[in-house]
Amino acid sequence: MTHPTIGILHPGAMGISVAASAQSSGCVVYWVSDGRSSDSHQRAQEHNLQDAGTLDNLCATCDIILSVCPPHAAEQVAGQVIGQGFSGLFVDANAIAPQRAQQIGRMITEAGAAFVDGGIIGGPAWKPGETWLYLSGERAREVAACFEGGMLETAVIGPDVGKASALKMCYAAYTKGTTALLSAILGTAERFNVRSELENEWSRGGSDFAGQTQMRVRRVTAKAWRFAGEMEEIAATFEAAGLPGGFHLAAHDIYQRMAQFKDAPNLPELAKILTALSNDGS
């Protein structure tokens, strides 16, 4: 069986695990070193990705290109690939609203390439059964076959572009949305000097909810800069469904106030996080 060659844009924490799963399934995976960070270089070298050097070389070499990037950059990455005359299969696996996935799909197909919509649920795919790539589109099964031997689980949920992204948005609306809500609750309780009493109430009956919540808030700070944009996408998804998007627009603001902790070498103390929340992140 001949496996397709795959290009990954880009090998961040999630992207490199996606690339590794494709490699485990027999695919050769390429990346673009031009303009990328030292962390990306290190990840690519550790996992033996093939360096295409530039985007034009990647587009000329690969059968399938997967976009795994921050939500705000989804159209930019797709546009850059189109600009190189890519005529293969483009997979957008970013955390974007379904209507944006459909728009990108039109961009890609009008340029002469094929498109599959993807949505990743879970963290980086280093353990079986924990991370799922949902796929929708006419050629979704071709993409799923590229990961059948790796840690990344796949599920094809239909031919309609936007369906995979909609599922991702609905799932993250709860998981990441509630973390933002809990962060805001702790920040408010701290400001009114009732956090101790609140956490005591949470701890009745031996529950560890208070401790779990504190750790959940501390851990999310490293990714808050990225989650902020995702909350805007969820809000847009809700509004497209005729529902109010205000829940997640507020969650966007919460994560934006945490963005200063992106490159912290250690988990920040809860007190520092709550101060940042009540001071507009400054």
Residue positions per predicted region:
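NAD(P)+-binding Rossmann beta1-loop-alpha1 motif at the extreme N-terminus of oxidoreductases
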Residues: 1-60, 84
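Rossmann-fold dinucleotide-binding core
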Residues: 6, 96-176
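Hydrophobic beta-strand scaffold residues
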Residues: 29, 51, 114-116, 154, ...
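Rossmann-fold NAD(P) dinucleotide-binding segment
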Residues: 55-115
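Helical "substrate-binding/catalytic lid" subdomain
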Residues: 167-269
